Swiss-Prot record:
InterPro entries: GPCR_Rhodpsn, GPCR_Rhodpsn_7TM, MC3-5R, Melancort_rcpt_5, Melcrt_ACTH_rcpt
GO CC field: plasma membrane
Lineage: Eukaryota, Metazoa, Chordata, Craniata, Vertebrata
Protein name: Melanocortin receptor 5
Stretches of the chain found on the membrane's Cytoplasmic side: 62-73, 139-155, 212-239, 298-325
One Pfam family linked to the record: 7tm_1
Tissues of expression: Skin, adrenal gland, skeletal muscle, bone marrow, spleen, thymus, gonads, uterus and brain.
Cell membrane among keywords: yes
Organism name: Mus musculus (Mouse)
Lipidation (S-palmitoyl cysteine): 311-312
Transmembrane segments: 38-61, 74-97, 115-138, 156-179, 187-211, 240-265, 274-297
Any GO molecular function: melanocortin receptor activity
């Protein structure tokens, strides 16, 4: 948000023309591209689907003791971050509907505060997602290259402390975002954080997969080699690769929008790109919808627990039968 903003995420979803730090900030859009409009119902539908899916993920992790491991705890943290995006967008959509239909009449100053909260929730969500993905990456790295010592290095207590630190840091970032919403340096800091964590994760992946093949050959000769554990570890690494790839695809346009908004807000071509901001919000919400599908696709245990919760909650005997398939 800058000094000229009156409404950011709210106005963007309504296709309004005010400027904002998370908004389109396109003053020359009439010379380039008209702002892309997306129905409010699309935002609400994706938000509700994402909310239900990620509640299901968290419920599965809580319900199934076989999922009580550091990796799935970090997956739960990622699900909470995804759920935060869906909640903020659903709340935003309801607020827009109430304002448009005059069911809610509030002062512009209070609307600005609501906007700040929405922006802060997006900030918290993206930082929490990045930190959770980084934690999963480190966990998979330890699992693959320190398999025999994994349970001594990554305990449930340590993973809990890591998650607590992640969310303390993310909430602090959100508070700073609200306090200094008029400063562009907050956005620069967010962009820098995104690319820094992305660099660390990609570097870790390159290192991990370059060494993985030689490492597998070396430990295969060991009498203590556990092929099942190794396959499980590699499967977890592939799952994380999919999560990271989807995260990059869905969030990169949003951060490119922020970069262009700061560097060339008056440029016609930059303005044209920024006119599609609503689509970038949709991509962010799609990320939170796709992640649970990846969990279900890659984890048989997660699929079984989903089936128990969705199809036969409260009917334990049929659930056990279904779990056998």
């Amino acid at each position: 948000m800058n000094s000229s903003s009156t409404l950011t995420v709210l106005n963007l979803t309504l296709n309004a023309s005010e400027d904002g730090i998370l908004g389109s900030n396109v003053k020359n859009k009439s010379l380039a591209c008209e702002e892309m409009g997306i129905a409010v119902e699309v935002f609400l539908t994706l938000g509700l689907v994402s909310l239900l899916e990620n509640i299901l993920v968290i419920g599965a992790i809580v319900k199934n003791k076989n999922l009580h491991s550091p990796m799935y705890f970090f997956v739960g943290s990622l699900a909470v971050a995804d759920m935060l995006v869906s909640m903020s967008n659903a709340w935003e959509t309801v607020t827009i509907y109430l304002l448009n239909n005059k069911h809610l009449v509030i002062a512009d100053t209070f609307v600005r505060h609501i906007d700040n909260v929405f922006d802060s929730m997006i900030c918290i969500s993206v930082v929490a997602s990045m930190c959770s993905l980084l934690a999963i990456a480190v966990d998979r790295y330890i699992t693959i290259f320190y398999a025999l010592r994994y349970h001594h290095i990554m305990t449930a207590r340590r993973s809990g402390v890591i998650i607590a630190c992640i969310w303390t840091f993310c909430i602090s970032c959100g508070i700073v975002f609200i306090i200094y919403y008029e400063s562009k340096y907050v956005i620069i800091c967010l962009i820098s954080m995104f690319f820094t964590m992305l660099f660390f994760m990609v570097s870790l992946y390159i290192h991990m997969f370059l060494l993985a093949r030689n490492h597998v050959k070396r430990i295969a000769a060991s009498p203590r080699y556990n092929s099942v554990r190794q396959r499980t570890s590699m499967k977890g690494a592939i799952t994380l690769t999919m999560l990271l790839g989807i995260f990059i695809v869905c969030w990169s346009p949003f951060f490119l929008h922020l970069i262009l908004m700061i560097s060339c807000p008056q440029n016609v071509y930059c303005s044209c790109f920024m006119s599609y901001f609503n689509m970038y919000l949709i991509l962010i919400m799609c990320n939170s919808v796709i992640d649970p599908l990846i969990y279900a696709l890659r984890s048989q245990e997660m699929r079984r627990t989903f089936k128990e919760i969705v199809c036969c909650h409260g009917f334990r005997r049929p659930c056990r039968l279904l779990g056998g398939y």
